[in-house]
Each structure stands twice: as C-alpha cells, then as structure tokens.
Amino acid sequence: YKKIMDNPPENLIFPGIVEPERMRELYALADLFLLPSYNELFPMTILEAASCEAPIMLRDLDLYKVILEGNYRPTTDVEEMKEAILEYREHPEALKELKEKAKAISREYSEEHLLEIWLKFYREQAALGKK
C-alpha cells in the first residue's frame, strides 16, 4: 500500500483530513464507495455514502449481510474488488442498479424511518405497561 500512496494513479487522491461540510460533495462525486476493511462495526461512512446515493462496495462480512440486506456489492478480496470495478466500468447500468440499492439503505436508516421504529417500540412498551 505504501507504494500506491507514494505514487498513486492520476485518478486516485489521498486528501488527508476532510472538513465534514465537504464530505457530502465528495460522496456525491464518487462513482463508487469502496470500504475494504475487515474490522468494522457499523461505520457511519456507509450511511453517509448511501445518503448521497453513492454505489457501495464492501468486504463480504456477516454483519453487513444482516444490516444492509444485500443493498451493496459484497467482495471477498482485493482481486474480486478489482474485477467488480472493471465490470462496472464496462457495464455502467450495473452501477446504476447499485446506486438504487444505496437509496434503499438511505431510506432504511433515515431519521423518519428510525423515528417510526422507535415510536412503534415505545407505544408497544407503553401498552404492555397498562396491562
């Protein structure tokens, strides 16, 4: 990785720390959001990318299968990530489908939807308390 960082290709930028206000713009510019990490819980970066409708590619972790319900492109290793990126370059319509899946993640974790879930939960608990 040091070799790539020291001499990145022209289409790869390492911006360092980015101001939060600028992140939405950068996510919106992204052709693909790729998070290759092995050890994540539930990174906010996924929700941020989804809220900007950036297509999402992640490592194939069990956690993501449960919380994102297939609304992303799972990959097992760097080679599969590379193949998927090349596939999207050749077939941009598949990338559009992935963008639609990002919208589904954004809806699922929107303030409005989460508020509905919590209100339902508290109403159910209040009803149980009255019995």
Model-found features: residue ranges?
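C-terminal alpha-helical cap of glycosyltransferases
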Residues: 111-131
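Short hydrophobic beta-strand element within catalytic cores of glycosyltransferases
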Residues: 55-58
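Short alpha-helical donor nucleotide-sugar binding micro-motif in glycosyltransferases
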Residues: 17, 25-30
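A short hydrophobic beta-strand element within the catalytic core of glycosyltransferases
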Residues: 33-34
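Aromatic "clamp/platform" in nucleotide-sugar-dependent glycosyltransferases that forms part
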Residues: 38
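Nucleotide-activated donor-binding/catalytic signature segment of Leloir-type glycosyltransferases, i.e.
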Residues: 1-18
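A short, well-ordered alpha-helix in the C-terminal region of glycosyltransferases
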Residues: 94-108
